[in-house]
A protein has these predicted regions:
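Alpha-helical transmembrane segments of integral membrane proteins
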Residues: 1-22, 269-273, 302-329, 333, ...
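Small-residue-rich transmembrane alpha-helices
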Residues: 38-41, 262, 300, 336-410, ...
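Mid-to-C-terminal secondary-structure elements
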Residues: 99-100, 114-135, 145-282, 355-361, ...
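Membrane-helix entry/capping segments
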Residues: 1-23, 52-53, 64, 108, ...
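Short, strongly hydrophobic transmembrane alpha-helices
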Residues: 17-45, 294-297, 339-344, 429-453, ...
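A hydrophobic alpha-helix feature that marks transmembrane segments and, especially
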Residues: 286-315, 327, 391-403, 448, ...
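Interfacial "coupling" helices/loops that link adjacent transmembrane helices in transporter permeases
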Residues: 295-339, 409, 705-746, 750, ...
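Membrane-proximal extracellular/periplasmic loop immediately following the first transmembrane helix
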Residues: 42, 49-99, 219-225, 457, ...
Length: 813
């Protein structure tokens, strides 16, 4: 009953000072919504396991080499690990790549994501089908034309409960549907929720490959997930797998030398993305912590003002025998109620924001919407974290005001205060304002650094011109073309597109720049080069035609480009970039020089040198790169590029029509090079948006905190201000005095924030592009922004009191 009486009394006090209460709850709701969103993202990316039974028993298995921090596993090694380990009940495998194909069922067709998996994929994960069955043991040993549908795709097909036994057709390959996964199963990787799974034994057939890649030990294509036996720890499993790695290295030194198995806890992130996700989450949580810190400082300042307004009540209670512990408890109850109100509002705001975030589906140019399966919605972990946050915030915001307001020298501390800067309470209030301003400055500096990084990325010399380039991408093999038919299709596609009015140039390539992968990695040795005398160099490459360079505006620096004479049976020639020429033939003319491709023991001759560019990622360092002729290196997947005389989107339909005339059944996607290059900036822009949101929150909190501090400090000095006016001081003089004192506090906070910003910049600079250790332009812009906010806030807060009747101020002070 005593506690309930205290709660009712605190609620009456907060209701009486409703303006202060509203500002405090608003500040905490904003900050705690940021905390809820930040922790939910962290929880979804790194804490929440796959939605399968006993997920803690699952570990992801990959390999490393001296030159690769992450690598897949070939099929023979997978079988060896699966059959010879002693720590796993079973081990599954799946290719890291997932692909899009039209899936035809009952005369209706829709593009879907499809993926090959080992026959034990669903059994290892513990996934029971909603209908039918999954794959059976032995399906990997012989091609088995079966398919398992995802719940969402089954719903799109009409949700037929008797669908098991019926067929779907993918690129003229018929598969029998054997089952449907439950709704709760969303795959093993966020961005790769397949619509259809088929056995690994069918992969070569599905891709119309003459040779099964599983027989090639150089194809490290697979990821593995193992389920630990009961009682087995991860260190024990790692030791067992690394022992098997040594056995494989001894048996197959050509492909497995120095290749070591590694394991990590299975999450919904690709293994090679976990470290980046941890860094991004750490930065996000650090920003959230700063925003919360600013909000706590703001509310603590407001509670100091509330304690000042309650000074007579607290004096009377102390005089009547209330202990200091009782006074502190009641003041902490006030702050806890404010934190609870802010926490409730913050949780609702976070829930609404996370609901929208869960529905977010990024669009990949040329391929459509990426079906992310990240569930950001709060779960029990987020709810517990938010409840703990309410308790911590209540303690953090109420402890300092409680200790101060219940001090033994209460009468001197709480009565008759005039000068803001000259009292103990004024110093505490100023310190809290400095903290808010410093935190806001640090967060705004972070926003500025992200903006500077994005501007630098947008100004990067890509090495090619993306403007006015329309493109089509198609898989000739998936469209039913043999290699001979595909080779004859190359010139037909070029000729058809070249006849379109407004098309200036047509080029072809097997991959796009900035695609996130290296096309083909070639192991080469250059005769006479120290760089490759001990170990072959790994050089990325792409196959292009003779018009590729002119279509994309890539400058020719030396030699020639490919010609019609460079046919399939002619000596293999390559064009290299400038960095490769400088690295392997320094001070020499590389034209006519030869190198040996170890992958196929093939001798190649350099015939031309072109300018450097960006090949895999927009923020990558300069790298050697080489080009093969499409006539000499056939590729089924090609990109047809057209340099147009205007907006390239207007040429996509004519290009599509031209190809449809060649083959009405041809399946392809359309996109523009500008859209593609802009997509490479998607993540930096998303990071900028997120940091800007938090920066805006910190700025609002700092402005609200500064307004409240000035408003309440001036209200406490109304007697002094009234006397000054009565003695002849003009309102302008009072304004200058208040502004001067406010600017001293703000300037100190900005200086502290800039110092913190320099430290933060050093910590995150590796995640930014082209950002100097100290970006003075960013720091100056933030300082000016904070200065402008100080002037406006101080004027708005002090104006009502400066216009008050001085005699009334003296009489009622």
């Amino acid at each position: 009953m005593a506690l309930w009486s205290s709660i009712r009394f605190s609620l009456r006090i907060l209701k009486k000072h409703w303006k202060l209460t509203s500002i405090a709850i608003f500040s905490l709701a904003i900050a705690m919504s940021a905390g809820g969103v930040g922790f939910s993202v962290f929880n979804a990316l790194l804490l929440r396991p796959p939605a399968v039974p006993a997920p803690k028993q699952l570990v992801s298995i990959y390999t490393t080499t001296p030159t690769e921090e992450f690598s897949g596993i070939n099929y023979d090694d997978y079988k060896y690990y699966r059959d010879n380990n002693h720590m796993f009940s079973d081990v599954l495998a799946f290719p890291y790549s997932i692909w899009v194909e039209p899936i035809t069922y009952d005369h209706q067709s829709k593009s879907g994501l499809i993926n090959a998996v080992s026959d034990n994929y669903f059994s290892v994960l513990g996934v029971r089908p909603l209908f039918g069955r999954t794959f059976g043991r032995g399906d990997d040993d012989k091609p088995t034309a079966e398919a398992v549908l995802s719940y969402s795709y089954w719903k799109w097909l009409g949700a037929d409960p008797n669908i098991a036994g019926k067929s779907v057709t993918i690129d003229r390959v018929q598969l029998t549907i054997v089952g449907v996964t439950p709704r709760s199963f969303v795959g093993t990787i966020f961005s790769d929720l397949p619509d259809l799974w088929y056995p690994l034994s069918m992969d070569a057939t599905m891709r119309h490959q003459a040779q099964d890649w599983r027989a090639d030990r150089t194809v490290h294509y697979l990821g593995m997930i193992g389920r630990l036996k009961p009682g087995v720890t991860r260190p024990q499993a790692l030791a067992d797998m690394q022992m098997l790695s040594k056995q494989l290295a001894a048996a197959y030194p050509e492909t497995d030398k120095d290749r070591v198995a590694q394991i990590t806890e299975t999450s919904m992130l690709p293994v090679d993305s976990v470290s980046s996700a941890k860094i991004i989450s750490a930065i996000l949580l650090a920003i959230v912590a700063l925003v919360l810190f600013a909000a706590c400082s703001n509310v603590a300042n407001l509670l100091l003002a509330l304690a000042s307004a309650r000074r007579h009540e607290i004096l009377v209670r102390a005089a009547m025998g209330a202990t200091r512990v009782r006074l502190i408890r009641d003041l902490l109850l006030d702050s806890t109620l404010l934190a609870a109100g802010g926490g409730l509002g913050g949780f609702l705001l976070a829930w609404l924001g996370l609901r929208q975030l869960t529905q977010f589906k990024p669009y990949l140019p040329g391929f459509g919407v990426i079906p992310l399966t990240i569930d950001f919605r709060p779960d029990i972990r987020v709810a517990v974290a938010c409840a703990a946050l309410v308790f911590v915030v209540g303690l953090a915001t109420g402890l300092l005001p409680g200790l101060y307001s219940s001090s033994p020298n209460l009468a001197g501390a709480l009565s008759g205060e005039i000068a803001v800067g000259g009292t103990r309470k004024g110093k505490i209030r100023n310190a809290l304002v400095m903290i808010q301003v410093a935190v806001c400055t640090v967060v705004l500096i972070g926003v500025g650094l992200c903006l500077r990084s994005l501007i630098n990325l947008e100004r990067v010399d890509l090495g090619f011109s993306s403007r006015n380039v329309a493109m089509l991408t198609l898989d000739l093999q998936a469209n039913g073309y043999s290699e001979e038919q595909g080779r004859s299709m190359y010139p037909r596609m070029r000729a058809a597109a070249a006849q379109i009015y407004g098309v200036d140039s047509i080029g072809m390539a097997s991959d796009l720049p900035l695609s996130g992968n290296s096309g083909h990695d070639e192991q080469i040795r250059v005769e006479g080069s120290r760089e490759t005398s001990q170990q072959a160099a790994t050089i990325s490459s792409v196959a292009v035609d003779e018009k590729y360079f002119s279509t994309l505006g890539i400058p020719v620096l030396a030699g020639r480009l490919f010609t019609s004479m460079d046919m399939a049976k002619a000596p293999t020639v390559i064009v290299i970039n400038h960095l490769m020429a400088e690295k392997y033939w320094p001070g020499e003319n590389p034209i006519g020089k030869t190198a040996r491709i170890e992958n196929g023991n093939q001798l190649v001759t350099v015939v031309g040198v072109v300018g450097d560019g960006k090949y895999i990622d927009i923020d990558e360092p300069a790298r050697p790169f080489m080009y093969f002729d499409l006539n000499q290196r056939y590729e089924a997947v090609v990109y047809l590029m057209a340099r147009t005389q205007g907006n390239p989107h207007q040429w996509l339909t004519p290009m599509s029509d031209a190809l449809k005339k060649l083959d009405p059944q041809l399946f392809f996607q359309t996109l523009t090079m500008d859209d593609w290059t802009n997509f490479s900036l998607y993540i930096p822009r998303l990071i900028l948006v997120c940091t800007s949101v938090f920066g805006g929150l910190a700025f609002v909190l700092a402005a609200v905190g500064l307004y409240g501090a000035v408003f309440y400090s001036v209200s406490e000095r109304k007697k002094e201000l009234g006397i000054r006016v009565a003695l002849g001081a003009a309102p302008r003089d009072l304004w200058k005095m208040i502004l001067r004192q406010t600017c001293v506090v703000t300037a100190t906070g900005v200086c502290l924030g800039i110092a913190g910003g320099i430290l933060a910049s050093a910590l995150v600079r590796s995640q930014l592009y082209g950002v100097r250790p100290v970006e003075w332009s960013v720091f100056l812009a933030v300082a000016l922004t904070m200065g402008g906010m100080t002037v406006l806030t101080a004027y708005s807060a002090a104006r009502p009191w400066m216009r008050a009747d001085p005699m009334e101020s003296v009489r009622h002070a």
